[in-house]
Amino acid sequence: MDNLDEDDLAFFSKPIKKPPLNYAKQLIASSSDSEEESELDTNKQALEHINAQKNITHNENKSAEPLSRQSTILDADEGNQDVSDTTPNACLNEGRHSPKSAISCVTQPVSPVYNTRAAANLRNNSINSEAALSTTSSLLDDDFARRLEEIDRQVQEFEKSSSDMDVQIHTHKREIEEDDDNTSADVPLLKHSKSDHSTLYHSKSEFSTNEPVISVVLQLAVIGQRIPNSNISLPRDWEAPLFFKVKSNQQFRRVRIAYSERKKVDNVVLVFQNQRLWDYGTPKGAGMLKVDTRLVVHAYCHSDFISLKRIKELEVEKLSSVTEDSTAQTCKLITLLLRSSKSEDLRLSIPVDFTVKDLIKRYCTEVKISFHERIRLEFEGEWLDPNDQVQSTELEDEDQVSVVLD
């Protein structure tokens, strides 16, 4: 029994090596309620009381007093029914005694059963506290993991929303660039090669800026035109001009529709400087700004415009045919240099269908001599037949021909 008491006391006398508290355990230890702190204080006071009692018991064993041993055995058999043991038990379980009562408790003899129960109580309290700490730490770990998952989910949602926003921005930017390209379709871009991309980028950037475009207001006088021998019935005020104020970037479609409604004539065609103005065209694209801001535009009925176009084509064909005839006639002339020992040299231009005899007559007329059959022409040592045409001979332009006068 004495060995058992010493082992139990040795268990409580040895220092307990506890692992260092982590951050979660420190939070739990700092946030514990007043009841747990009171229990820890009770266990600490009980441990101090047991150490003091150990010294007293060791001294009593050395003195070998049989009465104390006998009382100890009887207390163990009676199951802690002695009234004298109530005060230490109350001091250990409740821990509410004052320092004076603690001294009185130490001076009274304590049975080994009391020591065993105190050790079991302290061991159970330590196990329960460790279990509570492990359970609380596991709960904190689960909470921390859930918070990490929530943060990851928020990050993924942010990345997804940012990618969708980038796609919308790029789509909007592409639409703006397409609108700028359509607006600046009539404006010529700078010349560039395949290898020179900087020039093309610079030319596009000039028209894609957000600076406001200053439009010029033009005054157009639209006058109706008639063509001769036309079978189209037109209103009496067809040739009366109508004035329109048009911006430089405004399409001609509005002008044409307004003029047609005012004159009550369908299929009107607008013409400026012999060029048709299409509905999608603008004054800036038609080059009106280079001429003036007050201009005259001619209006034709569509059928009259087709007839006028055909007449102009015929005139162009006729003019080209006349030019071809004059060019052909010019090509049929040949220039020859005629030399004689009895007269001066003479340069003549004659058609190639002339005969050699006609060439001789022309020469006699120029030098004012009488024509006779004995006058002959020699070219490169050969006599030319008077009945041959010039184009059938080997004569070419600027050749020299000798005239022999007999």
UniProtKB/Swiss-Prot annotation:
<dbReference type="GO" id="GO:0005634">
    <property type="term" value="C:nucleus"/>
</dbReference>
<comment type="subunit">
    <text>Interacts with rfp1 and smc5.</text>
</comment>
<keyword id="KW-0233">DNA recombination</keyword>
<comment type="function">
    <text>Required for repair of DNA double strand breaks which occur during replication, or induced by UV or gamma radiation, via recombination between sister chromatids. This has a subsequent role in the maintenance of chromosome structure. May work in conjunction with the Smc5-Smc6 complex.</text>
</comment>
<keyword id="KW-0539">Nucleus</keyword>
<dbReference type="InterPro" id="IPR029071">
    <property type="entry name" value="Ubiquitin-like_domsf"/>
</dbReference>
<dbReference type="GO" id="GO:0031297">
    <property type="term" value="P:replication fork processing"/>
</dbReference>
<protein>
    <recommendedName>
        <fullName>DNA repair protein rad60</fullName>
    </recommendedName>
</protein>
<dbReference type="InterPro" id="IPR022617">
    <property type="entry name" value="Rad60/SUMO-like_dom"/>
</dbReference>
<dbReference type="InterPro" id="IPR000626">
    <property type="entry name" value="Ubiquitin-like_dom"/>
</dbReference>
<keyword id="KW-0234">DNA repair</keyword>
<dbReference type="GO" id="GO:0180016">
    <property type="term" value="F:SUMO ligase regulator activity"/>
</dbReference>
<dbReference type="Pfam" id="PF11976">
    <property type="entry name" value="Rad60-SLD"/>
</dbReference>
<keyword id="KW-0227">DNA damage</keyword>
<keyword id="KW-0597">Phosphoprotein</keyword>
<dbReference type="GO" id="GO:0000724">
    <property type="term" value="P:double-strand break repair via homologous recombination"/>
</dbReference>
